[in-house]
Structures are given as C-alpha cells and as structure tokens.
C-alpha cells in the first residue's frame, strides 16, 4: 500500500497570481490516505500552537512512563488484553452514544484488562487527547495512544498527555521514519507498537532494529474490511522468526467472542486489542470478562 502524505495540487502561475488546479489525483485514494492528509494539517496547527521545545520542557518534569511492554508480557489472562476506549470509527460511525471515556477505562481496569488503548483522533474517531489525559489521571494501567503518527512531534505530544506507548503504522511510515520514530520512543522510555497488515509489511518491520512489539491489524485500512485470517496467515508464515527475535505480537480488530479469543491463542499471538465489541455493550467491563468465558450467558 502506498500512501501519499499530501494531496498533489498542480498550480498555474500568472504573474504574481497562483491558481491551484483540481485534478483526479487531488482526491484521496482511500480512507487511510484521507486520514493522513488531514493529519498533516492537524500537526501543522499543533506545532504552531505549542512548539516542540516547549513540549520537551514539560515532559522533562513528568514522572517516567509505565512499562507497557513488560506489563503485556506478564498479563493475568491466557492472552494479554489491550482494551480500547473508542467512541466512533469511519466505518461504523458512532459506536456508543453515552460515551464516558474515564468510566469505560475504569471498568476495563476493574475487569482484568492488561493495558488500555485510547483513540485520540478527533475528526474520524471522535477521540481526543483530553480523553487520554483524563484517563491517565484515573487509572493505573499503561496507556497506548492510538492515532496516526506521521511526525516525531506527535510522539512527544502523546507522551505529554500521558501515553506510555504509541502506535506506529507501517503502511504510512517509511523504513527510515520507523527507525527514527522508534529511537525517539525508546529515548522517552515508551513502547512502540508497530502495526502491519500484510506479509510484506511484516517483513519490512522484522528488518528494523529495536522493534519489540508488533500489532497485526485484521482490518484493511484502505477499505476498513476485517478478516481474522490475516493474523493466522502472518503468524503461520513468520512465527519462528518472531519468536527468535523475542518480539511480542498483538492481534488487532475484529475480535468479538470467546471463539475469536481461542482462534488467536491457536494462532500463537501474545495479546489482543479489543475495542468495538466491548464499547458497544452496556457494561464494557463485563463484556471483557465474557470474552474469556465459554459459558457466558
């Protein structure tokens, strides 16, 4: 998958005037590209509002982040669980109308979640960094900032708001970007969850030094379709290499039932990331426990 970072806008100059010409290529090819183009504008705005040097000063005064990776490897359940606080998505719209992020996070913590993921993208997922900060103040579990990171600035911004880990999506980052971002994440004492969807992306990531945690996304970010076989196929192809390198693997998206959990155990992953199937239930905490209970009512 090739994602263009900015829309190509051919321009015609006439003297001191410059006219942008609309062409078919000026439109995003898929949802992921649309998100990335909007993220470019968002980061420009944030950097103007609060320069990186100011972020780093504030971060230096913060306590160190929690150890997301170690916590995942010592989960209390057969599979570690990253429970996600998520209000909406581009494919499903609003998932939960009475959305109270702190209350949901507390229910996760009370019901055996290993770590918590917080959607912070505002435009497409109706999340916010304020949600992340508020959850950080109210729960003790390590937090993953779930967003679309395309600049190092966003790593620092996530840390400032309480993130212990960040998501790095291989489909929107070059190898050079991934290497540099991972160095920054490590320098801040955080964890990088590097996300892949295809075998080609997985092989790219396996060749990058410093990767310790990989997420296999069962959701195709071009059209947001979901197939749990994605995890099974990638694990079947590269399980030995992953184990040899000591890399933990998280299966992300599309996990709704006890049967799905068993499927992932058999696939050989170390953890699952679950959001939508929990948030849409009346009690997300109870829903989390029921994922591991064959005799749920």
Curated annotation (Swiss-Prot):
InterPro entries: Aldolase_TIM, Indole-3-glycerol_P_synth, Indole-3-glycerol_P_synth_dom, Indole-3-GlycerolPSynthase_CS, RibuloseP-bd_barrel
Domain of life: Bacteria
Catalysed reactions, as listed in the record: 1-(2-carboxyphenylamino)-1-deoxy-D-ribulose 5-phosphate + H(+) = (1S,2R)-1-C-(indol-3-yl)glycerol 3-phosphate + CO2 + H2O
Annotated keywords: Amino-acid biosynthesis, Aromatic amino acid biosynthesis, Decarboxylase, Lyase, Tryptophan biosynthesis
Pathway the protein takes part in: Amino-acid biosynthesis; L-tryptophan biosynthesis; L-tryptophan from chorismate: step 4/5
CDD domains the record matches: IGPS
Listed GO MF terms: indole-3-glycerol-phosphate synthase activity; phosphoribosylanthranilate isomerase activity
Family: Belongs to the TrpC family.
NCBIfam families: PRK00278.1-4, PRK00278.2-4
The name this protein goes by in its record: Indole-3-glycerol phosphate synthase
Gene name, Swiss-Prot/TrEMBL: trpC
């Amino acid at each position: 998958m090739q994602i263009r970072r900015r829309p190509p806008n051919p321009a015609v100059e006439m003297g001191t005037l410059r006219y942008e010409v609309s062409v078919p290529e000026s439109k995003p090819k898929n949802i992921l590209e649309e998100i990335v183009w909007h993220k470019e504008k968002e980061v420009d705005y944030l950097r103007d509002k609060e320069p990186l040097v100011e972020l780093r000063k504030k971060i230096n005064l913060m306590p160190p982040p929690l150890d997301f990776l170690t916590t995942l490897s010592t989960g209390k359940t057969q599979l570690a669980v990253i429970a996600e606080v998520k209000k909406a998505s581009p494919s499903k719209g609003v998932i939960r109308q009475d959305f109270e992020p702190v209350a949901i996070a507390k229910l996760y913590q009370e019901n055996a979640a290993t770590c918590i993921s917080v959607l912070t993208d505002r435009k497409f997922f109706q999340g916010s960094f304020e949600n992340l900060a508020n959850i950080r103040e109210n729960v003790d579990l390590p937090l993953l900032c779930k967003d679309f990171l395309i600049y190092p600035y966003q790593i620092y911004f996530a840390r400032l708001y309480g993130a212990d880990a960040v998501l790095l999506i291989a489909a929107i980052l070059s190898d050079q970007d991934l290497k540099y971002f991972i160095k920054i994440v490590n320098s801040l004492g955080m964890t990088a969850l590097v996300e892949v969807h295809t075998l080609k992306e997985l092989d790219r990531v396996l060749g990058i030094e410093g990767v310790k945690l990989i997420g296999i996304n069962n959701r195709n970010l071009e059209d947001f379709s979901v197939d749990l076989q994605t995890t099974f196929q990638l694990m079947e192809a590269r399980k030995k290499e992953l184990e040899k390198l000591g890399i933990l693997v998280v299966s992300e998206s599309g996990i709704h039932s006890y049967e799905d959990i068993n499927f992932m155990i058999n696939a050989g992953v170390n953890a699952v990331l679950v959001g939508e199937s929990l948030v849409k239930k009346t009690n997300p905490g109870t829903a989390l426990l029921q994922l591991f209970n064959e005799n749920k009512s």
